[in-house]
Amino acid sequence: LLILLIGWSNPLELQAVIPEEGRGLNPLLQHPAMAIHPPSLYLGFIGFSIPFAFAMGGLIRGKLDNEWVLTTRRWTLLSWYFLSAGLILGGQWAYEELGWGGFWAWDPVENAALMPWLTGTAFLHSVMIQEKRNMLKIWNVVLIILTFGLTIIGTFLTRSGIINSVHSFTQSEIGPAFLVFLAFILVIAFGLLFKRIQILESEHKMESVLCRENAFLAQNVLFVSIAFTVLLGTTFPLLAEAVRGTKLSIQAPFFNTVTAPMGYALLFLMAVGTLIPWRKTSMESLKKNFAWPFLLAFPLTAFIAFWLRDELWSWDGYIIFWLAFFVCATMANELIRLVRLRSSQSEDSAPVALFMVIRRNLRRYGGMLIHFGAVLIFLGVAGKFFSLERDLTLTKDQAQTIGSYQLVFRGVSEIPVENAIHRAAKVEVLDLDGKRLQFLNPAKSFYPTQPQPLTEVGIRRSFWEDLYLIFSSENGESGDSVTLRVFINPLVGWAWMALPIFTLGIAICFLHRPGRLVARETVLKERFRAAEQALGTS
């Protein structure tokens, strides 16, 4: 970092020309999420350097047992959480500020943060196998090397200025330095891994195809495959331009088509992987754990199909709904079974039994809560498959119907704000019975420092869906007519609810203390007391 600051990007370097007035913060960044989103991503990126450093230290010493996994578990969890928070808040910012009706577009800068999150998630699951079964030691080191390397690639893509992105607000000359650093890190890390590969051999082997180890391994392969797909789709246009001089653009349909089946498989394994026993299981056990959740997901999905609009149909959306219901039903089945067992043995009430069940294995049920948050994100994505989009031209005081809403245009007004002027269309939102629900003010914002007006969307939020208005144009000089782009986005708000659920899940996981770590701390405390007593008597 010091070399970068001195050689490439000195923040204290004087400008050649001193402007009379600064341009101020880019208006697109004037959003509450921007106070948290960049620091969260930064903390997530640098946080993964800690388990990486411990792994490299173990390789250098030639001693890499499970100690480094236990010692860095909380750092890994915290880094994963901050990356997750950064991604969710970034999606919320894009949804509210960029004015296109969505929250994820597979933009290169979005992908830069997603890739280490994917491999970091794989690492979090894979180290459980090392802790429980002393397996996959080599794979875990590879995963943490890849995760740290992808944080460097992400920084390079974001800061180098070689890509066009709606999220890129600055350019610098530090890109080549990051590539040199990345190459140096990867050569040293994989060199150490190959040198010490004998000490990382697994102590056990897979005993059955149907076991939790294989479910986690399949999950790992899917996470890494998605990360590789995203990396390929993000960097291939750069490579093509460098080699052939041809400018290419890989758009969202490529990513959606390739990653969707892998995402569905991950959601399925989310239900199956946590309830399959270690080592091996039987078909009878599978039926016991998964039969009724598997069947219950079908009528629940049919209910959603009946509730959604008749003119909208999406196999992808219904597949996600079925998988989400399967995951939730599986988790509910597990909790109900354990609570009943606890109640029958101790005569505790159901709430007390639930508390005691969770308390006995905080890590497991904190992870289950995080899985539920991930299901909410998938449901938010599924809702976009049923999004309704229309361009409406509204005449003053006349209503038009879209979905379950009536929109009445009440005129255009100029609203001065602190550093801009909003030219807003006042739109009254009614239900189909004519009851007023809300006034929305989608606008064009004029900033003195910006050559073009920016879009300010109007959003009516509800538990089930968002009504999302974009002020496209004002028709005529009198302002008696406007054209709006209108979206009805089902379930999009559920994706934002994942963040507080992740927060609670991580907090519960942090309360878990591995027995071996507690024993180690006890030994250290006893040694410290003995040393104090020895010093006191000398």
Task: Give residue ranges: language-model regions.
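Solvent-exposed, non-transmembrane regions of integral membrane proteins
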Residues: 1-538
